[in-house]
């Protein structure tokens, strides 16, 4: 195992990379489609119909490229989450296992965003063009995106984000406190095993609620929706535990206010 002087910078570097990737993901999924950052190619009149698009190489080739990028991300994210790979990584990297997983996921997502090919000439599933929809639909989408991202950040705070990012494992190791998961209750461990993506609904809102749902955006939203759906396995016991934890967090947050009122 590497000394603490190497473990801490490695975990911090992974966290910074993940944070920067998250900021870039907000730009990629929200700011670009909402603020018109997608390059145009002749406007709506130049777009192909659905049947014509199936024979247009200028549409099929970038879609195939985008599909490959998404499959690369999904493959990395799923493969490194398997027990076999996690055991191998824990054996050779120790407490940096989670940080390495987070860093690799961030790099895979960076590849998707950096090399993503828009398809401006492809057909669209829907598009707000005529007034008043051209004004109000983007505004409504913007509001829903802001709410969704605020909820995502709030949920990450309710969950143990330091452990999700791999920081807590290194912190506990340096202080000799053991494995953080070993201190959690069986109900919490059961929840974490079922809920790999605690912000599923909010991410789906960000992916689908856009003024113009073009071909490449449809591919992105559809594939990630399928992936999130397959990875989401909550049951009633998990929901009861989540509700109890949320009430506990709210009670703790309200205690200082109660003290001031007294």
Curated annotation (Swiss-Prot):
One cellular component (GO) term of this entry: nuclear envelope
Transmembrane segments: 5-28, 59-80, 98-114, 134-164, 192-210, 217-234
Keywords assigned: Membrane, Nucleus, Transmembrane, Transmembrane helix
Nuclear compartment segments: 1-4, 81-97, 165-191, 235-262
Perinuclear space side: 29-58, 115-133, 211-216
Main localisation: nucleus
Membrane topology: Multi-pass membrane protein
Superkingdom per UniProt: Eukaryota
Subcellular location: Nucleus inner membrane
Family (UniProt): Belongs to the nurim family.
PANTHER family (alphabetical): NURIM (PTHR31040:SF1)
Protein name (record): Nurim
Species the sequence originates in: Sus scrofa
């Amino acid at each position: 195992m590497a000394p603490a002087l190497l473990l801490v910078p490695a975990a911090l570097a992974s966290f910074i990379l993940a944070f920067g990737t998250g900021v870039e993901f907000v730009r990629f999924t929200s700011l670009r489609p909402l603020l018109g950052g997608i390059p145009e190619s002749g406007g709506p009149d130049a777009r192909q119909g659905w049947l014509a698009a199936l024979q247009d190489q200028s549409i099929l080739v970038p879609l195939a490229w985008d599909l490959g990028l998404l499959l690369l991300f999904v493959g990395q994210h799923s493969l490194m989450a398997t027990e076999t790979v996690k055991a191998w990584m824990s054996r050779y990297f120790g407490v940096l296992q989670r940080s390495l997983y987070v860093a690799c996921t961030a790099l895979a997502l960076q590849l998707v965003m950096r090399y993503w090919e828009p398809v401006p000439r492809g057909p669209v599933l829907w598009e707000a063009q005529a007034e008043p929809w051209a004004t109000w639909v983007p505004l409504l989408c913007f509001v829903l995106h802001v709410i969704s991202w605020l909820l995502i950040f709030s949920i990450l705070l309710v969950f143990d984000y330091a452990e999700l990012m791999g920081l807590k494992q290194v912190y506990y190791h340096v202080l000799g406190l053991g494995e953080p998961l070993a201190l959690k209750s069986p109900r919490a461990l059961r929840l974490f095993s079922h809920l790999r993506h605690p912000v599923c609904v909010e991410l789906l809102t960000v992916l689908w609620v856009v003024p113009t749902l073009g071909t490449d955006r449809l591919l992105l939203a559809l594939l990630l929706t399928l992936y999130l759906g397959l990875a989401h396995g909550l049951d009633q016991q998990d929901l009861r535990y989540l509700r109890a934890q949320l009430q506990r967090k709210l009670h703790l947050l309200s205690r200082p206010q109660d003290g001031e009122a007294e």
